[in-house]
From Swiss-Prot:
Sperm (at protein level). It comes from the Eukaryota. GO terms for cellular component: acrosomal lumen. Keywords: Cytoplasmic vesicle, Fertilization, Signal. It comes from Haliotis corrugata (Pink abalone). This is Egg-lysin.
Amino acid sequence: MKLLVLCLFAMMATLAVSRHRFRFIPHKYIRKEFEVALKVEIIAGFDRTLVKWLRVHGGRLSTVQKKALYFVNRRYMQTHWQNYMLWIVRKTDALGRPPVVADYSRLGAEIGRRIDMAYFYNFLNGRNMIPKYLPYMEEINRMRPADVPVANRGK
């Protein structure tokens, strides 16, 4: 009963605080070739960070846990795709010309480089929270970075 009351108060507080500040992030859509350039560079940056992190901290991890961390890279990109799009739209609008694939590759590489995934890996590893490796993770890991699904319905 106490837990129910606590959850109810937490929900009410969340609604009260977020009522005026929370905004839905509208979806931004881009053409397929731009999406592919972004995904390839973002995942390449995340994977480079993971390789460096595994070189230092990966000795204690099993092969399955390492595969799960590669999945975490892809899922992180999928989860934050629309937030990336807000930043990307702002950057491409600032160009003053129509963007090309190289612009999206450069922005994707910047995202992959700037996001501190090593902190995230340390967090997961330190708290023993690396997810169990499941069949759907294997499916996504086997995909080329260009084929990883994201919430984009561009042409």
